């Protein structure tokens, strides 16, 4: 896939009184066309500031911004005219925690408002607005006013409005944080559907790992203006390297706490700890029994969990294997033949390879 967003060595600094605040520090990020890319971090991590550099709503202090093959910012200055920048911004839709709808205007006119500067006729604008409402499941609410809608329905209107200019990129900035869990999932599922149906690239800013886990395929975790970890969702979720990443990935943190509770101490030469990751196709296999039968190892399961990542169930198991050292060395090769991912870990739950 081709990169649709490229951020290189991005710095954003602000002056507060006599102090210089480094909101974003030397960040590099590549988003491929069709990605749903989650940017996760606590409040103040710099994630919204970073993502707003994509359309230069926040101009970097330094670095390079390229969107869809066009160089927007480099050498400490904007590289295109303001007119061209406005055109680029229309190719990037945005939705927020607050819906920002016009309360005195009908739902269909709220969507049509985004097309007021287009070359379409009034009739064409109304037709397009109605089609967008149908796309987000609100065709029956076209003549309603925002106050008559639920929070989830208002966010659907905001999504329809954000899609009015046929953007290739949609930035979702904490768009579900004000919604209840059920409505949150409905909005996330809608974004996933739009990604598949329209080929829409989505950048999902959130402090909620569950939102990323539900729909994203890639993730970056930010802290104090720095990306501390990034990669494919599955890789980061199942094997987080940084402490903050483990906090966001509750399953990994729970596994590590469980290992600590076993108080394993230093492992002897005839003991090894492994993390096993397996797909739904392998769930029915008795891995512990197979290791005993094939390699003569005594295996104890210390922790197990199943998560749904990218709509697929993925199982994780931490095991302690005991036996002859040469047999322990064969665990990884044997299980890989069974399509089970194997990573050796130490007694603290730190990934060694």
Swiss-Prot record:
The record's subcellular locations are: Cell membrane
UniProt: ATP binding residues: 41-48
State where it is primarily located. membrane
Molecular function as annotated in GO: ABC-type D-methionine transporter activity; ATP binding; ATP hydrolysis activity
Q: Which PROSITE patterns match?
A: ABC_TRANSPORTER_1, ABC_TRANSPORTER_2, METN
Q: What class of enzyme is it?
A: translocase
EC numbers, comma separated:
7.4.2.11
- One Pfam family, please name it: ABC_tran
- What is the topology of this protein in the membrane according to its UniProt annotation? Peripheral membrane protein
**All copies of domain ABC transporter, residue ranges:** 7-249
Q: What does this protein do?
A: Part of the ABC transporter complex MetNIQ involved in methionine import. Responsible for energy coupling to the transport system.
Description of how the protein assembles with itself and partners: The complex is composed of two ATP-binding proteins (MetN), two transmembrane proteins (MetI) and a solute-binding protein (MetQ).
**Family as reported in the entry's similarity comment:** Belongs to the ABC transporter superfamily. Methionine importer (TC 3.A.1.24) family.
Name under which the protein is recorded? Methionine import ATP-binding protein MetN
Give the originating organism.
Ligilactobacillus salivarius (strain UCC118)
């Amino acid at each position: 896939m081709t990169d649709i967003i490229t951020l290189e060595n991005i710095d954003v600094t602000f002056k507060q009184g006599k102090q210089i605040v480094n909101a974003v520090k030397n960040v590099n990020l590549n988003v491929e066309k069709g990605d749903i890319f989650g940017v996760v971090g606590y409040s103040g991590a710099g994630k919204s500031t970073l993502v707003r550099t994509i359309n230069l709503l926040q101009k970097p202090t330094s670095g390079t911004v390229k969107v869809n093959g066009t160089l927007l910012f480099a050498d400490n200055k904007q590289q295109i005219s303001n007119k061209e920048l406005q055109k680029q911004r229309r190719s990037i839709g945005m939705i927020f925690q607050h819906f920002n709808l016009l309360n005195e205007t009908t739902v269909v006119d709220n969507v049509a408002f985004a097309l007021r500067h287009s070359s379409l006729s009034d009739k064409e604008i109304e037709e397009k607005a109605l089609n967008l409402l149908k796309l987000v499941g609100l065709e029956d609410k076209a003549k309603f006013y925002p106050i008559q809608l639920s929070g989830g329905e208002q966010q659907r209107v905001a999504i329809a409005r954000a899609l009015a200019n046929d953007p290739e990129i949609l930035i979702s900035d904490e768009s579900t944080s004000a919604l209840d869990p059920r409505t949150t999932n409905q909005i996330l599922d809608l974004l996933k559907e739009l990604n598949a149906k329209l080929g829409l690239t989505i950048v999902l800013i959130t402090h909620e790992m569950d939102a990323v886990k539900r729909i994203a395929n890639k993730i970056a975790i930010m802290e104090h203006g720095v990306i501390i970890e990034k990669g494919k969702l599955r890789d980061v979720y199942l094997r987080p390297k940084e402490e903050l990443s483990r906090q966001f990935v509750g399953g990994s943190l729970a596994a590590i706490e469980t290992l600590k509770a076993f108080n394993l101490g230093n492992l002897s030469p005839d003991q090894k700890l492994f993390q096993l990751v397996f797909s739904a196709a392998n769930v029915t296999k008795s891995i512990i029994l197979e290791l005993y039968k094939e390699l003569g190892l005594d295996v104890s399961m210390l922790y197990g969990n199943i998560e749904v990542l990218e709509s697929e169930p993925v199982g994780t198991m931490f095991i302690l294997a005991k036996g002859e050292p040469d047999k322990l060395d064969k665990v990884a090769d044997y299980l890989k033949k069974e399509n089970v991912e194997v990573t050796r870990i130490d007694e603290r739950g730190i990934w060694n390879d």
